[in-house]
Amino acid sequence: MDDPPELNPAQQEVLAQLGASRDDRPRFDAVIRHELRRTLDEGLEPHVEELAGDTMFVSKHLLGRVMGCERRFLAEDDEEFAWSVPLARGTIAHKAIELSIHWRREPEPLVLVDESISRLSEGVDGLADWLQTCTEVERAELRAEANDRVVKFLECWPPLKAQWRPVTESRLRLEIHDIFVLSGKVDLSLGQAEGDRAGKVLIDLKTGGFAPQHLDDLRFYALIETIRLGTPPRLLATYYLDQGRFLPEEVTEALLFSSAARVVDGVAKILDVRRHESDPNTAPGPACRWCVALDDCDAGKRYLSDGDEADGSDW
């Protein structure tokens, strides 16, 4: 039998951050899922008549956008979605990590990336169409950028054991009033609940540096997961691959109800901004660098001319 691989300090830190004894894992009252759902039901009910017959999809990205710059939010509303290297690299990298968990040979990052591209090209969705028609330059850039992320993940993380129940890009969905659909995909989840005792860890993998929205993203997922399962996750953890650094946050009832309130406030703001009843605000920041409204935004240009650094980004 082969000896287990020796772990480097970054990998040892991951184990230390994610590990917890059974006694250290909190327990939650089963009624919390019903109270959270009631909070959303009551908070979103005033908008039911306005949206009757329609479906409103609410994601972490939509909430993050409207809580930021309203001008950018409206500009992106008018943009037709199109796949690109920056949008596809995360999905490719996540698929490669998923394959690495079950790979029977030594995981070679670029081999995993190529297998992921091949597998996802066989689909019937928009990403598959783009992968089948992208240029050779785009494909080369995609391989390079996805490979960088997979290499860093395998360097910084210990091999994921089957008993940890690792799942990549786990889909979450919650429907309220048959109108509002809260949904998303968790980059990586580990562990499981034991009855009312929390045990699951939700992990978001990022490049770049910290942004406050990263905390809200995982809290949003924790809210949906709690209503789905009844037992909240134990821990939320944003992991910055470029830095080899964790930003962990323990899940509490207060955190979950705060997230529910943010969803209610966010939906109200989305509908208000889209009515165009008042001028949208402008909130210059690192995201101005890739904003579709930058050409006509003096505030954004001034911000970038000051040389502010870009914040962290999703995969």
Task: Label every model-predicted segment.
Residues T168-A261, D265:
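Mg2+/Mn2+-dependent nuclease catalytic core
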Residues A96-S170, E175:
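A non-catalytic, helix-rich entry segment at domain boundaries
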Residues V85, R89, A93, L142, ...:
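Hydrophobic (often cysteine-bearing) scaffold residues that line and stabilize catalytic clefts
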Residues M1-E6, D24, V48, I227-W315:
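Metal-dependent nuclease catalytic regions and adjoining charged, substrate-binding loops involved
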Residues G90, H94-I101, A222:
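Short, amphipathic alpha-helical segments that act as regulatory/interfacial helices
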Residues C69, A93-H94, L188, Y221, ...:
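A residue-level signal for conserved active-site and pocket-lining positions in enzyme catalytic cores
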